[in-house]
């Protein structure tokens, strides 16, 4: 690259030409760009590619001081799902889960959960099976609304004794666990959202009966970056499969 570049403006043709064969962004074999529009907020340019026949490129430039990320509001919005209706209000995303129908008949319709339908969670041999729900357009206001509650059922027929493969030497647990974890994450971080997560694990849960659990995230009530709830049964990092059930999910005060 050159130490510096200049440009020439043709007001009649409404074009802008860069010096020294310079180009904006994607190389299109030209240094001349047509000015489509110019305002105080944005400059729009275009060019016909000379190296990709039939292609045309558009460019948008805005003042540096205006190139800021939009502010994402923080809201206290309650979430609840009992899985009884055909259209779910909280429809969990399934990651590396099994193929069994996830809305399932209650395996034990007795107190404390006599409802007709529940959620069947089928952990596969994948190391990081999980389900998650991400809200759109806002982040969680955890000031008061910081409790996740659900009813869970841990079947005894799962194989909790055998040793299974793990994701690596750093994984110390290689058996299926009678547990459930709930995590709050920042979805903006994508595949690295676990790096800033807050996780609560309920371990060594009693089997073959419905249990009412509460996950209290009041310790991170000042966080403003979370917008994703992850639920994970049986532990992670190992290939042990298992089936679990939960119902009456809520995120509230």
Regions found by a protein language model. Name each.
Residues 55-56, 60-253:
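Beta-rich carbohydrate-recognition modules and glycan-binding surfaces
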Residues 1-6, 10-76, 225:
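Lipid interaction determinants
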């Amino acid at each position: 690259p050159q130490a510096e570049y200049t440009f020439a403006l043709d007001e009649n043709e409404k074009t802008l030409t860069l010096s020294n064969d310079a180009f904006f962004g994607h190389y299109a074999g030209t240094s001349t760009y047509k000015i489509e529009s110019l305002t105080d907020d944005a400059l729009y340019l275009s060019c016909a590619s000379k190296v990709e026949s039939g292609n045309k490129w558009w460019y948008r430039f805005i003042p540096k001081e205006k190139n800021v990320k939009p502010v994402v509001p923080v809201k206290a919005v309650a979430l609840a799902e009992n899985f009884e209706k055909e259209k779910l209000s909280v429809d969990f995303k399934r990651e590396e889960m099994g193929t069994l129908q996830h809305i399932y008949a209650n395996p034990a319709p007795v107190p404390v959960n006599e409802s007709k339908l529940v959620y069947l969670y089928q952990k596969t041999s994948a190391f990081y099976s999980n389900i998650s729900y991400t809200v759109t357009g806002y982040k969680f206001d955890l000031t008061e609304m910081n409790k996740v509650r659900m009813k869970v059922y841990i079947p005894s027929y799962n194989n909790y004794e055998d040793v299974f493969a793990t994701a690596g030497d750093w994984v110390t647990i290689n058996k299926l666990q009678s547990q459930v974890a709930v995590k709050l994450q920042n979805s903006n971080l994508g595949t690295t959202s676990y790096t800033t997560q807050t996780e609560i694990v309920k371990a060594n849960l009693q089997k073959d009966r419905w249990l009412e659990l509460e996950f209290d995230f009041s310790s991170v009530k000042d966080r403003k970056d979370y917008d994703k709830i992850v639920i994970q049964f049986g532990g992670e990092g190992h290939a042990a499969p298992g089936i679990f059930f939960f119902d009456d999910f809520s995120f509230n005060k």
